[in-house]
Curated annotation (Swiss-Prot):
Enzyme class: transferase
GO molecular function: ATP binding; metal ion binding; NAD binding; NAD+ kinase activity
Primary residence: cytoplasm
Keywords: ATP-binding, Cytoplasm, Kinase, NAD, NADP, Nucleotide-binding, Transferase
Function: Involved in the regulation of the intracellular balance of NAD and NADP, and is a key enzyme in the biosynthesis of NADP. Catalyzes specifically the phosphorylation on 2'-hydroxyl of the adenosine moiety of NAD to yield NADP.
Active site per UniProt: 74 (proton acceptor)
Location(s) in or outside the cell: Cytoplasm
Protein name per Swiss-Prot or TrEMBL: NAD kinase
GO biological process, one term: NAD metabolic process
One term under GO cellular component: cytoplasm
This enzyme's EC code(s): 2.7.1.23
Pfam families, A to Z: NAD_kinase, NAD_kinase_C
Reactions listed under catalytic activity: NAD(+) + ATP = ADP + NADP(+) + H(+)
Amino acid sequence: MQNKIDHKNIKKIGLVTRPNVSLDKEILKLQSILSIYKVELVLFKESSEILDLPKYGLDDLFKISDFVISLGGDGTLISLCRKACEYDKAVLGIHAGHLGFLTDFKVDEAENFFQAFFQGEFRIEKPYLLSVFLEDKQGKILEKLAFNDVVISKNNQAPMAHIEVFRKEKKFNEYFGDGLIVATPAGSTAYNLSANGPIVYTLAQAFILTPVCSHSLTQRSIVLPKGFEIEIMAKDCILCIDGQENYKMNDFKSIKVGLSDKNVALIHPKNRDYFQILKEKLHWGN
């Protein structure tokens, strides 16, 4: 993953917006700002039906762009980050949605950001993703990435989930309840937090297992290091990646999860303070 961006030689910036919402006004404002720096704004083909701007499929957009803007909420950014890993491209999150824990600022603040950006005043953070290996009954392995979390939950027919977790073929825990969350540090402030899981610093090389509504008072979250791969077995359960992709666990004979070697470069304002964000979003202190 790239460690830096050559801000002096940016030619094209891609833009992907929150789906099913018209953000043409915001797009035009960003285009106007970027034109000052002689940078072309190019769109994902589904981001606008009206605007007469160059439009591309998602793969082509990543290929031609120096980096890509996510204009929406956290969900838009999360799905884009998984794609960015394929092309080794950075992502900038601009808020225009419901949830904004990961996005740093709104379009109204973009002029100040880009003024600083093109002077080299920005920072890049590279949180790690989860690798998920799904092996079907024929032995074919599908690898997926998760930015926030992988959630195993009971289906509608099961009274509760029975989930077994192994490491190197040795069982180290068994969960009875509504499900199990496997979260990245970046995802520790999402579903994991609402299930009383711990907050883990975004750039930590670790991941979290958090039971959901466990039927045992002794079951608690556990933080595991990079290099620790787990195998999860559960019947009549659904595996969900980042709240966006669902798989029936009965369709697979093996599911393994661990912290990936892949990370994604997120562009932030230089003065971004992770702990200040926690304080504001979670209403810590005064």
